[in-house]
């Protein structure tokens, strides 16, 4: 039976998808208008043959393509499960190709991704700047939940938060200021409670615990 082989190649495909998922995130963060992180760029390296100013994420772009090659081997492995009378050799020619291709490619991709992450350049100041561009909108969910916990219905809470959020979108207003100027919101929450919902540290309070769990060590 080749079902165990199919499960093996499916697992390789899932790992490849995770590699691509991480790679796409890095590629997005390296976009010129975002620039929250980027692949290491050595002196004299060319980022684009046509536009000298660019610093393209060539390694993670390569990893995206390699991930597709690994996943390409999953379907043939699934098709190999159906053999005549539990045994013929129609699977053999397939496995002789996808076996080496999938495993070697994935091994290379994992090594490359490890290197990319080890040398990844991070720009925390740009992360903060990008967050601040939205004038507090990223905290809308916490305000919504706080209103419901204060006894407001979810529908009413949503309306209160949304109308203030839309003024930020449409008029460039400050979200916290709009909430403090909304009499319906202020009847439920005070200024200190609103300000508390805008604390970015709330969203990263478990980071050390997560790293400790993943790496099985104290951070």
Question: How should these model regions be labeled?
Answer:
Residues 51-219:
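Glycine-rich cofactor/substrate-binding loops
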Residues 1-83:
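Internal glycine-rich alpha/beta core junctions
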């Amino acid at each position: 039976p080749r079902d165990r082989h199919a499960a093996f190649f499916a697992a390789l495909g899932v790992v490849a998808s995770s590699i691509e998922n991480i790679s796409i995130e890095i590629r997005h963060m390296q976009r010129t208008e975002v620039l929250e992180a980027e692949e290491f760029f050595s002196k004299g390296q060319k980022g684009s043959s046509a536009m000298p100013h660019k610093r393209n994420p060539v390694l993670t772009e390569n990893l995206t393509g390699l991930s597709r090659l690994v996943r390409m081997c999953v379907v043939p492995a699934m098709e190999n499960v159906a053999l005549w009378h539990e045994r013929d050799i129609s699977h053999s020619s397939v496995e002789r190709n996808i076996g080496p291709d999938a495993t070697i490619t994935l091994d290379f991709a994992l090594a490359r991704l490890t290197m990319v992450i080890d040398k990844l350049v991070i720009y925390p100041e740009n992360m903060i700047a990008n967050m601040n561009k939205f004038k507090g909108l990223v905290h809308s969910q916490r305000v919504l939940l706080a209103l419901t916990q204060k006894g407001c219905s979810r529908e009413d809470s949503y309306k209160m938060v949304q109308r203030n959020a839309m003024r930020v979108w449409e008029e460039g207003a400050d979200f916290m200021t709009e909430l403090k100027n909304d009499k319906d919101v202020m009847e439920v929450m005070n200024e200190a409670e609103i300000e508390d919902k805008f604390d970015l540290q709330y969203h990263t309070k478990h980071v050390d615990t997560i790293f400790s769990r993943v790496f099985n060590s104290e951070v």
